[in-house]
Amino acid sequence: MIACAAVVSPAAAAEPEAASHSRWSALPVPAAALPPSVSDLAARGPHEAWATGSEQAADGQRPMLYRWDGAAWSRDTTFPGADVPGRLGKVQFVGEETWIFRTRDGAGEIMRRSAQGGWSTVPLPQALWTYQDFAAVPGAAWVVGEDSTGLKVLHYDGSRWTSQPAPDGVLYLMGITARTATDAWAWADTSTGAGTTVLHWDGARWQDAKVPLPTNSNVHTMLLEPSGRMTIVGSQYTDGVGRTYLMTWNGREWRTTYPALGDAYAAALVRGPDGALWLPVRSDRAFQSKYARVDGRRLTYSYGPERTNAIDVKPRVLATVGTSLLSFGTVEIYGSKPNLLSERLGGRP
């Protein structure tokens, strides 16, 4: 039996205080063709992080890949098809390899980078109309989306692809994440009247995990941690008005809180090096980014560095990089199109 305790944060009654101890710094990023679009940011450790997305070219979108080496960002164009239209998406670390999902010409594939820096590709067994999400761990990878027949859950075991059935009533998988080859989780839209449902893969089948999500809610993302702790974040809607919720599994029960984030989109939520949850939020200052820190019932904010003549500063994704937090996104300077930005909290100035 799964228990659920609901707790409303006292921060909801007052505007959270600014995190005065936080100091974000700007990091130079080599320019992309304008305007760029950011997909993902993931870090293996303090000396390796990858940011993906696409940039605009005359013939459409081109894949965009940047690497952080602990000191600086650099552009990586060594992967096959770097000059071919397409887009790079989610980054996963599988053993010593880096796996990146890519779409081009309507087809999907996994790009694999070895520890020595060589690239190879694993094509999907079929093209999909939509590629919703991707997850990979040692011994397994999943791509979820849709084709003309409906929902597709494609599973790769390291040598071949198979199509996995979803439970009855599941219409669409909106996201997927995995801790191991026999411990994967997904959130789905269903026709059962339950709305969003969390599913679990145990190595044999997908089934309803019976997670007691708030009524009339969706899921933005799930964080799986090696300790077994899980965090789900999403929005709950009452009379058309949304508010952000957090659910945490501590090994015994689900605990639900409602930090005073309004209806912030929290898909970029990460566990920071300080143990708190962090996410970029919409800033009330056009010339600075803004980040929220949730530590239990305590909610604080911090701002990025001031950017001269900026009219829109949008960090899109976050990653924990050793003892630092790293963000990647876009900044629009008055009179020009958006270009890339990166900011760091902690580390060398």
Residue ranges and their predicted role:
Residues 1-16:
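Secretory targeting and sorting signals
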Residues 15-349:
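Residue-level hotspots at or immediately adjacent to binding/recognition sites across diverse folds
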